UniProtKB/Swiss-Prot annotation:
Residues 7-21, 67-85 are annotated as: Hydrophobic. The lineage of its organism: Viruses, Riboviria, Orthornavirae, Duplornaviricota, Resentoviricetes. InterPro entries: Rotavirus_NSP4. This is Non-structural glycoprotein 4. It comes from Rotavirus A (strain RVA/Cow/United States/NCDV-Lincoln/1969/G6P6[1]). Keywords: Activation of host autophagy by virus, Calcium, Enterotoxin, Glycoprotein, Host endoplasmic reticulum, Host membrane, Host-virus interaction, Ion channel, Ion transport, Membrane, Metal-binding, Secreted, Signal-anchor, Toxin, Transmembrane, Transmembrane helix, Transport, Viral ion channel, Virulence. It is found in: Host rough endoplasmic reticulum membrane; Host membrane, Host caveola; Secreted. Glycans are attached at N8, N18. Homotetramer. Interacts with the immature particle in the viroplasm. Interacts with host CAV1, early and late in infection. Interacts with host integrin ITGA1/ITGB1 heterodimer. Interacts with host integrin ITGA2/ITGB1 heterodimer. Interaction with microtubules blocks trafficking to the Golgi apparatus.
Length: 175
């Protein structure tokens, strides 16, 4: 029985559209006919597609408000696309999802900045320690005996009899 009433309803809508189109065609100055026909076709298609969909959705879903809201937003977005607009209507849920995504990305970037800042602070501290070590030792205080391997070399006061054993001695040879 429902199919029969849907068929009667559809035929009455088609009859209404045809009569509307005939009255538009009778006017000789009507230059916007293709646009009006396109709009009427879209409206009829949306009407025929959305009514059964909404009926099924309302019967099967527990949360009818969200379904109705989603259907209406989808219909308006379709109409906006057909009109040539690039903007779309978004629901609160979509806005909240986008906000959550933005907040998550901001947190990730803040953590990265924190890690980089910590690393930079550690590098600055390391450079400061290196600089302090270089600046504390004066040139006079550096023990070069370790560098040239002369730890066991004696000074002039430490030599026996005060003579340097490494100085060449005068040698006289017989001729």
């Amino acid at each position: 029985m429902e199919k029969l009433t849907d068929l009667n309803y559809t035929s009455s809508v088609i009859t209404l559209m045809n009569s509307t189109l005939h009255t538009i065609l009778e006017d000789p100055g009507m230059a916007y006919f293709p646009y009006i026909a396109s709009v009427l076709t879209v409206l009829f298609t949306l009407h025929k597609a959305s009514i059964p969909t909404m009926k099924i959705a309302l019967k099967t879903s527990k949360c009818s408000y969200k379904v109705v809201k989603y259907c209406i937003v989808t219909i308006f977005n379709t109409l906006l696309k057909l009109a040539g607009y690039k903007e779309q209507i978004t629901t609160k849920d979509e806005i909240e999802k986008q906000m959550d995504r933005v907040v998550k990305e901001m947190r990730r970037q803040l953590e990265m900045i924190d890690k980089l800042t910590t690393r930079e602070i550690e590098q600055v501290e390391l450079l400061k320690r290196i600089h302090d070590k270089l600046m504390i030792r004066a040139v006079d205080e550096i023990d070069m005996t370790k560098e040239i391997n002369q730890k066991n070399v004696r000074t002039l006061e430490e030599w026996e009899n005060g003579k340097n054993p490494y100085e060449p001695k005068e040698v006289t040879a017989a001729m």
